[in-house]
Amino acid sequence: MTLILGIDPGSRITGYGVVRDTGRGCVYVASGCIRTGTGSGELHERLQIVYRGVREVIKTYGPVTMGIEKVFMARNADSALKLGQARGAAIVAGAEEALEIAEYTATQVKQAVAGTGGANKEQVMMMVMHLLKLTQKPQIDASDALAIALCHAHTRSSLIPHGLGTARSRGGRLRL
């Protein structure tokens, strides 16, 4: 049974989701959001909150692997850069705790969880609730993080029969 951490990075709100992969499916462990505040806090202060928050989640739940969403190019380049920096803070937190880290596009996550890369957030949330047998809707960023964790569990289980379950690239980051 493997504990998997999913991270939906953001410079204002970073979602996290922890699931246990039993080999026959996934079981919900925890989820939530790391909020950096809505004030005009400096970016470096918000990134430090993301880093510390992810480390705290790792220390609390003890996952051995982490899936994180890749940056997409938004219309606003500044937003994409801030998102990339928040991802970096989360990745460093995972790397410091020696987690195996894999990155997924939003389309890959939607495909793995909802069966189509064009699924909307509500469809993804409903599938997350169904797959993890949740009775209440999680926060949207936490739902996205749980979807990333489920995608990572699915991808890991499909790689194991091919002898790639322990594949690692430099620095422990898998590039799928």
From Swiss-Prot:
Binding site for Mg(2+) 2: E69
Principal location listed in the UniProt entry: cytoplasm
Textual note on the cofactor: Binds 2 Mg(2+) ion per subunit.
Top-tier EC class: hydrolase
GO biological process: DNA recombination; DNA repair
Cofactor(s) this protein cannot do without: Mg(2+)
GO cellular component, one term: Holliday junction resolvase complex
The protein's Enzyme Commission number: 3.1.21.10
Reactions accelerated catalytically: Endonucleolytic cleavage at a junction such as a reciprocal single-stranded crossover between two homologous DNA duplexes (Holliday junction)
Binding-site residues for Mg(2+) 1, renumbered to this chain: D8, D141
Record's subcellular location: Cytoplasm
GO MF term list: crossover junction DNA endonuclease activity; DNA binding; magnesium ion binding
Entry superkingdom: Bacteria
Keywords, in A-Z order: Cytoplasm, DNA damage, DNA recombination, DNA repair, DNA-binding, Endonuclease, Hydrolase, Magnesium, Metal-binding, Nuclease
Record: active site: D8, E69, D141
Record's subunit section: Homodimer which binds Holliday junction (HJ) DNA. The HJ becomes 2-fold symmetrical on binding to RuvC with unstacked arms; it has a different conformation from HJ DNA in complex with RuvA. In the full resolvosome a probable DNA-RuvA(4)-RuvB(12)-RuvC(2) complex forms which resolves the HJ.
Family indicated by similarity: Belongs to the RuvC family.
NCBIfam families membership: ruvC
Function of the protein: The RuvA-RuvB-RuvC complex processes Holliday junction (HJ) DNA during genetic recombination and DNA repair. Endonuclease that resolves HJ intermediates. Cleaves cruciform DNA by making single-stranded nicks across the HJ at symmetrical positions within the homologous arms, yielding a 5'-phosphate and a 3'-hydroxyl group; requires a central core of homology in the junction. The consensus cleavage sequence is 5'-(A/T)TT(C/G)-3'. Cleavage occurs on the 3'-side of the TT dinucleotide at the point of strand exchange.
HAMAP family, per the entry: RuvC
Name of the protein in its database record: Crossover junction endodeoxyribonuclease RuvC
Annotated source species: Pseudomonas syringae pv. tomato (strain ATCC BAA-871 / DC3000)
